[in-house]
Amino acid sequence: MLKTEHISFQYEDGKQALTDVSIDLEKGNIIGLIGANGSGKSTLFMQLLGINKPSDGTVYFEGKPLAYTKKALFALRKKVSIVFQDPDQQIFYSNVRDDVAFALRNLGVSETEVEARVTKVLDIVGAKDFQHKPVQYLSYGQKKRVAIAGALVLDTDWLLLDEPTAGLDPIGKKIMMEIIERLASQGKKILISSHDIDLIYEICDYVYMLKDGSVLTDGETSNVFLEKSNVEQAGLVQPWLIKLHQQAGYPLFKKEADFFAHTGKVTN
């Protein structure tokens, strides 16, 4: 269990970044965290990783208030991993397998287990075809997959994804969505922070909407986006499938493929 209860956070310069924020990562399998720039999404990620301690309120990990000791934070970060928007921020080795194996080797895991776990996570993210390529020859999307593999190799339970589809072409976005859904089907809990509203709508089963460091609203994804006034208040726009439903009278579809199947059109 990973959640926050009524947390607030103020930076040293006096800026209030979060105010009375409560989120529960058990609310869904793939949870969306949305809001305009400066709404507190990145700061909230840092709270969930124990990097910053709340000024008020509590972060709960595995049913207990998070203790900010070295031992407690080590345990937290073995189970909660982040993948940054820019994969170059967390890829340090020139070889894919060595990079993914880094954390395990640093922990003294046997080489036999290292090889087995690295192979497993590379398969999960579809990176086996380029596992022996030098990192500098990988595409941006391939680097993102390597970064996810590096986060998964510790057998993390919660995965925090910062803008997972940013900078990807349509095929790369499709592959990333498939990876996220595959991880969720395998029992991983995923929190996605993204400005890609259509991605959030299609892939997430629960959404928290932030505005000025507070939770403006939260709930099942379709219900959140159907409330146009809240979406606009947060400085966002509705997903196109929601607009089609409300403005053109189409049935409400959650996935693009379902809409095109309904209209008899074919999409890749």
Swiss-Prot record:
Membrane-crossing residue ranges in chain numbering: none
An MF annotation (GO) of this entry: ATP binding
Keywords recorded for this protein, A-Z: ATP-binding, Cell membrane, Membrane, Nucleotide-binding, Translocase, Transport
Residue span, ABC transporter domain: 2-237
Gene Ontology BP, a term: cobalt ion transport
Subcellular location: Cell membrane
SMART domains reported for this sequence: AAA (SM00382)
Residues that hold ATP according to the record: G35, A36, N37, G38, S39, G40, K41, S42
EC number(s) on file: 7.-.-.-
Topology within the bilayer: Peripheral membrane protein
Keyword Membrane: yes
Broad class of where this protein is predominantly found: membrane
GO cellular component assignments: ATP-binding cassette (ABC) transporter complex
Pfam families recorded: ABC_tran
Source superkingdom: Bacteria
Similarity section: Belongs to the ABC transporter superfamily.
Function: Probably part of an ABC transporter complex. Responsible for energy coupling to the transport system.
Protein name (Swiss-Prot/TrEMBL): Putative ABC transporter ATP-binding protein LMOf2365_1216
Species of the source: Listeria monocytogenes serotype 4b (strain F2365)
